Amino acid sequence: MMIKGMAEDDCADNGIPLPNVTSKILLLVIEYCKKHVVESKEEDLKKWDAEFMKKMEQSILFDVMMAANYLNIQSLLDLTFSNCR
């Protein structure tokens, strides 16, 4: 929603700033968003989310969480928060 809002407000003409979001983190966020846009069965999403978190390195979990927060992706923020060890 944050990116959509910036685009609608013509604030994205020169790019959208993503401070402290590396390409590696952005790719993970995009992967998550693509799956959640396409998939409709909640049970399948829960399985996919579990695998997504299982393969995520603990060292980048906080970075994904911060990106989800900055980009206002509440479901990803909730998922990463619930997987903090």
From Swiss-Prot:
* Stretch list, region Interaction with the F-box domain of F-box proteins: 65-85
Q: In which pathway does it act?
A: Protein modification; protein ubiquitination
In which domain of life is the source organism classified?
Eukaryota
Recite the UniProt keywords alphabetically: Nucleus, Ubl conjugation pathway
SMART domains reported in the protein's UniProt record: Skp1 (SM00512)
One GO biological process term: auxin-activated signaling pathway
Give its localization.
Nucleus
Task: Write out the function statement from the record.
Answer: Involved in ubiquitination and subsequent proteasomal degradation of target proteins. Together with CUL1, RBX1 and a F-box protein, it forms a SCF E3 ubiquitin ligase complex. The functional specificity of this complex depends on the type of F-box protein. In the SCF complex, it serves as an adapter that links the F-box protein to CUL1.
Name the chain's protein.
Answer: SKP1-like protein 6
**What is the organism field in this record?**
Arabidopsis thaliana (Mouse-ear cress)
